[in-house]
Amino acid sequence: MKSNNEIINIDHNVLIWARKRLNLDINEVAHRIKKKPSIITNWENGKSKPSLSQLETLAYDVYKVPLATFFLPEPPDEPPINQQFRTIPDSEITRLPYKFMLLVKEAQFYQEALKELFDGRNPVDKPIFKSITNLRGGSIQNAATLVRERLTINKEKQSKFKDSTEAFKYYRNILEVNGVFVFQQTLKNYCRGYSLFDTEFPIIIVNSSETTDTGKNFTLFHELSHLLYSMGGISNEYTYQSTNQIEISCNKIASLILVNNNELVQELKEYDIDLNDIKDNQL
């Protein structure tokens, strides 16, 4: 049995990988384990080695990985997170907070659990993300209409919701019936939600900290739109204000899924309201 104080010979590149995957810098790691930054630097450049006890602290308290990870001959082949969030520049990706990155890793675990539970195949024969594709260059209105039809979202259905909470429950359930699993995490002010694409088990995460479900409903369909583009996304202030064409399209599609333009215009006419008199933030 190895002593906790025994120095462990590991590949220092695994230490670098474990830190960078969570957007941590050396000073932050040093602070969390109460060591000088120079000690972490020496571990990562191979000049010195951590003890078993120090590795346990890194694994369980900081990097949140199994201890056995550090005994691998090389870093795991884990796709970088920017392959999911392709509409966000790397400069923004590297600024995502450590605690948010931990939540993303937790969500990736959910995906792996789903794959194991369903033997690697989505339980829905024709999930929505395989039925509605090729959004690039297509009509945004048409995409929204297809989603509304597939999910049975219409004026009659929506008028029966007593509030946004009941609407959210319906939207979440109907998405899962159509092959997209939805989870909630306490995301605080990191973002309103995000999505992770997978060819069989894409998932949407919404912020349980939202004060109302109205925001959750928009987030659901913004992130669904990302999945229909075969990519993940993040719903935050950066992406809402982004000039990236896909982000703009996702915002528009989400809005049109929730409120059908033709139905809105017809209802306004019934109340003798001129659409030109309504500001965007009133819609």
Task: Give the positions of each predicted feature.
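Short juxta-domain linker segments that transition from a proline/glycine-rich
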Residues: M1-L283
